[in-house]
Amino acid sequence: MELRLYNTLTRSKDTLRPLDPANVRMYVCGPTVYDHAHIGNARPVIVFDVLFRLLRRLYGEGHVKYVRNITDVDDKINARAAERGITIRDLTEETYRWFREDTAALNCLRPTVEPRATEHIAEMRTLIESLVASGHAYVAEEHVLFHVPSMPDYGRLSRRPLDEMVAGARVDVAPYKRDPMDFVLWKPSEAGIPGWPSPCGIATPGRPGWHIECSAMSWRHLGETFDIHGGGIDLVFPHHENEIAQSRCAFHTGVMAQMWMHNGFLMLEGEKMSKSLGNFVTIRELLAEWPGEVLRLAMLSTHYRQPINWTRQGLGFAAKTLDKWYRIIGEAEAETGEGNPFETEIADRLADDLNTPSVITHLHHLAEVAEHEEASSALRRRFKGAANLLGLLGDTETGWRARQKEAIALDEGVIAGLIADRLAARKAKDFKRADQIREELAAQGVVLMDNKDGTTSWEVSR
């Protein structure tokens, strides 16, 4: 089976040809651990989990190494710890635990390695000193900066004109820079801010810049070059562009990673998600209302490279779909491996640039087959095994029902709020919205009953 993936570097679908098929290597940029992860953060986690599962099927579980870093040194972390009056270590440990719990609820496999930036300072210093020695970086006022003009094909990934790169680089304008595009590899730490012995003979303790962290961790765990580098589309520039510059110039290689993959943006009910708009929602908040599997199916219903509009209606549809699928499989065990033709059909579709919408459409077809054919026992096992490749249907019908009720029991306040919204919509004669709320709740197993006195009560239907 040939795996073709869209490569941001070439702007085309390329066939993955691992540098070493016995050791396929993938790096994905992970979270900065200072707060609860929002639903936008869940998209790359789920997308690259699906790719990890597919790679393991194609090359063998013991032949794929998936590295997703943890950024635990960052100015946002310092500010949040000071705001909360706790130590930086306590903050990063707490938020990393939250992230682990959230991703487990989304049924994501643990990466092979989850390196922390603070545990790779030595590798960062080594890279920085190598870049200075080769003329690609320089020391200025206790900072070390990468000199962008030293790399003739800088910008190859993002393909932005120079003026756009300068405008979008988010770099500080400092008089000690040789060029406005130059970016920080190392900076001094003020009192009370984490600091380590600096490279290049700088006497003041300091801390790394953001970009050098990923270059160091990918080098330490995957080598100078590797197969796949992934992340959100917002990381193409400047983060991934700068990673490439650092790594290629340090190791004198033509590429850092063969494939660069990026997932699209997430919108919330048609709007950009932001705290200022009051529509910022965390994974944990959504998990209080819906089983994680619902979030996962809703996320995979849109192709990973396309923008996704995250809506309650979409979540309701995903919940209804899973309800039907679990009813079909009942308590069946999954049949996995090459002997399951359903799983092979799913793998074929995923091999076309992780075409999860096509996979889900085909799963709907397989569900109908498993539901109506006479040899339904074997077909149910195969259907479940096929869905497992997408990280779905890992439970039994009994377990699914229990998780639904558990989510509902945790969220009576949310249900009450939706009922109030529905009553307001009915009063305003917005019957379409009122019906939509009823359907959303029904998808979660909540049945509404309109009473003669104008109030609405509810009960769990399953």
From Swiss-Prot:
Subunit organization: Monomer.
NCBIfam families, sorted: cysS
EC numbers, comma separated: 6.1.1.16
Cofactor dependency: Zn(2+)
Location of the motif 'HIGH' region: 31-41
Amino acids binding ATP: K275
Domain of life: Bacteria
Name of a matching Pfam family: tRNA-synt_1e
This protein's name: Cysteine--tRNA ligase
Location in or out of the cell: Cytoplasm
GO biological process, alphabetically ordered: cysteinyl-tRNA aminoacylation
Catalytic activity, reaction form: tRNA(Cys) + L-cysteine + ATP = L-cysteinyl-tRNA(Cys) + AMP + diphosphate
Disulphide linkage map: none
InterPro entries in alphabetical order: Cys-tRNA-ligase (IPR015803), Cys-tRNA/MSH_ligase (IPR024909), CysS_C (IPR056411), Rossmann-like_a/b/a_fold (IPR014729), tRNA-synt_1_cat_dom (IPR032678), tRNAsynth_Ia_anticodon-bd (IPR009080)
Cofactor stoichiometry and binding remark: Binds 1 zinc ion per subunit.
